[in-house]
């Protein structure tokens, strides 16, 4: 009977250790995914800034020509 108790405790202990390791790996994977998402959102924000600067530059050069052609 004592042998069965020890075996059962050993199985439960090994199961808990295995479960703990799996949970830790899962958390690490989730952290990596969050970091990738953060990097992608930073890239998108940077891209929008570049787009707005480009639009501003184009508008700055085109608007004087549009207004001068309307006055003529």
Swiss-Prot record:
Domain of life: Eukaryota
GO biological process, one term: defense response to bacterium
Comp. bias intervals (Acidic residues): 30-41
Subcellular location as annotated: Secreted
Tissue: Expressed by the skin glands.
GO cellular component: extracellular region
Range of residues in the leader sequence: 1-22
Keywords (A to Z) from UniProt: Amphibian defense peptide, Antibiotic, Antimicrobial, Cleavage on pair of basic residues, Secreted, Signal
Chain segments carrying region Disordered: 24-46
Propeptide residues, chain positions: 23-43
A Pfam family recorded for this sequence: FSAP_sig_propep
Function text: Has antibacterial activity against Gram-positive bacterium M.luteus NCT C2665 and against Gram-negative bacterium E.coli K12D31.
Family, similarity comment: Belongs to the frog skin active peptide (FSAP) family.
Protein name in the entry: Caerin-regulated peptide
Organism in which the protein naturally occurs: Agalychnis callidryas
């Amino acid at each position: 009977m004592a042998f069965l108790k020890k075996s059962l405790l050993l199985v439960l202990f090994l199961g808990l250790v295995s479960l703990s390791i799996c949970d830790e790996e899962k958390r690490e994977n989730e952290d990596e995914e969050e970091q990738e998402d953060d990097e992608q959102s930073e890239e998108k924000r940077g891209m929008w800034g570049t787009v707005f600067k480009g639009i501003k530059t184009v508008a700055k050069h085109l608007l004087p020509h549009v207004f001068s052609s309307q006055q003529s």
